[in-house]
Amino acid sequence: MSYAADVKKELTGLIVHAGNAKAELAALMRMNGVSTLGFDQTIRVQTENAAIARRIYTLLKETYVEVEVEVSVTDHNHLSQHKSYGVLLKTKIDEVLDDLGIDPFGLHPEVPPRMLNQVDKRRSFLRGAFLAAGSVNSPERANYHLEIYTTHEELAEQLMIMMQEFDLPSKISERGNGFIVYLKRAEKIVDFLQTIGATQSMLKFEDIRMMRDMRNSVNRLVNAETANMQKTAIAANKQVSQINLIIDTLGSLDILPKKLRDIAKARLEYPDETLAELGEVLDISKSGANHRMRKLTQLATMIEQGIDYDLTKL
């Protein structure tokens, strides 16, 4: 099961207060779409998620006690087990749709203010909208993304305004024949999940994200350390070659000034050490070791280029 499916499974198991059930139900039916069937004007809400179908059925039965509701299942492909679920509202259709502020013909996609006049109602509406038409990438993926899709621009703008109220700075983008309201920042996706009541999914998102960020930090440190080690090894090999050139030219390191002689011998004895570590061997600072090594490099360069040199001035 995908992470998004886990989130929706958690949300469909939440117990919703009766005062907020209508807001969630309004979003579920509005975002899934309602269609009229047959001469008896039965209303059908279709979804491919069995848990969401059960959620719509349960909320309808609990909110409107006397309505007649059924769930139908359509098997589209026996091999892939692809099924869709229809929630059929058979009685009190006009009453229910009017109470939920839903226009069955889609001519008025905006949500009536009375459905959203309390903070918890707006939370519930966002939850229903996500259940019906939302998705979220797994926190394991590099690109964090949460979105809600709607075919109506007016509804997309309402969703964006609702999300902004909870400090969720979403954006709207056109996609196909509709619009998506989306979040890209991981911390805001976490806040959205908490806002709509997906607490366990939110904690899982945070745990996975923290582990992923930690692995990335460790990898960056390892890469940086590896690069530094390679850089140190290249520099040390060059220094050893320069010291050997000096020995070949002078016949011995003994005629060098003591400070240069000591650093040269230390480098030959410890070819893999950093300059700071060579400084510790000689009981001098890193800058002191670096200064002496530069003097040896200067001498080796003069030898290579055939330039006259004075050892007493090094």
Swiss-Prot record:
One of its GO terms (molecular function) is DNA binding. Keywords: Cell cycle, Cell division, DNA-binding. InterPro entries: Homing_endonucl, Intein_endonuc_central, Sporu_reg_WhiA_N_dom, Sporulation_regulator_WhiA, Sporulation_regulator_WhiA_C, WhiA_LAGLIDADG_dom. It holds the Pfam family HTH_WhiA. One of its GO terms (biological process) is cell division. It comes from the Bacteria. Signal peptide: none annotated. PANTHER family: CELL DIVISION PROTEIN WHIA-RELATED. Belongs to the WhiA family. This is Probable cell division protein WhiA. The lineage of its organism: Bacteria, Bacillati, Bacillota, Bacilli, Lactobacillales. The gene is whiA.
